[in-house]
Amino acid sequence: IADGVYVHFIPTQKYKTNRIVFRMTGSLNKQTIAKRALVSQMLATANQTYPTVQSFKERLASLYGTQLSTRVLTKGLTHSVDIELTYLKDAFIPTNNGLFWEVLGFLKECLYKPLSRVAQYQNKVFDVEKQNLKTYLDVDTENNYYYSEVKGRELYFVNEGLKVPKYGQAELVEAETSFTAYQEFQSMLTRDRIDIFMVGEFDDYQVLQGLHRFPLEGRQVDLQFSYSQPYVNVVKEKIEPRQSSQSILQLGYQFSCQYGDKDYFALIVFNAMFGEFAHSALFTTLREKEGLAYSISSQFDIFTGLLNVYAGIDKKN
């Protein structure tokens, strides 16, 4: 509907609900990851029209139980923030009163009437969400599998952005303020690539008519969805002592195959047979047959070329 702004229709009659996903995608940068994660928190909490968590939730409930959620994700050297709304189709509403327009209006309020004051988020709500995110990250760090995965990525990747988890790190979140996060949000609205996914049953003309009411201007976006790390014939190792009932082994392997390459599907099948599923070689041999690991699996990120193998093992072994 404008340069750098795309609408995707995904028709389906499987569900009683329709889903709208508004995605903002920018370049992956260590300096903005925490800001963007805080933006995702604020989008799901309140806005100027509904300035408290309670009034925000009550409005969603009044829209026949419409659900709103946000998430962040990375793909290659990009970082995305999603705001998702799931609501009942008109056929399942007694009044059949055009719920689509109300839901779209609520989305517009979340995006263009954020809970702000003088070019920054309202401090009271922002401080709560900031603390919630820090607590979430601290709890994750206490999980040995998550902690070892983060440390493995720090050791493997040379790109600073890829070393950082998609929600940031506690120290990065702590450094942000209601002003810096709000300014990042304004930049996202005007500079990020925008993808709007309409999943369900929609009137295409009605959707485009509604979205043209959003002040979405064209933007030039240059994004790198695939990352190919320079090959280095050096094995990096790190051992970190930690109090735990079991030890975690993380292994990272580099593959040059990228999404869409001729070997892409073969590599996906290989990973499934190697370690991703319960019938894979790693699980059936090392865990079930040999008993060398409490748990073991593999995962492959086609957008960075990293094959990760992780296992919970007895520290004596």
Predicted regions and their residues:
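His/Glu-rich zincin catalytic helix
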Residues: I1-L63, Q169-L172, Y182-T285
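Short, polar/flexible loop-turn hinges at active-site or ligand-entry regions and domain interfaces
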Residues: A46-T49, A91-P94, K113-Q122
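Short, amphipathic alpha-helical segments
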Residues: P94-W101, G105, A119-D127, Q131, ...
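Structured segments of extracytoplasmic/periplasmic soluble domains
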Residues: Q41-T45, L63, F106-P114, N132, ...
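Scaffold signal of the M16-like zinc-metallopeptidase fold and its non-catalytic homologs
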Residues: K134-T190
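M16 family metallopeptidases and their MPP-like homologs
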Residues: H8-I10, K16-N29, A34-R36, V53-E109, ...
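A common structural junction motif
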Residues: G105-R117, R213-V221
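Acidic/histidine-enriched alpha-helical segments
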Residues: K57, K113-L137, L223-Y231
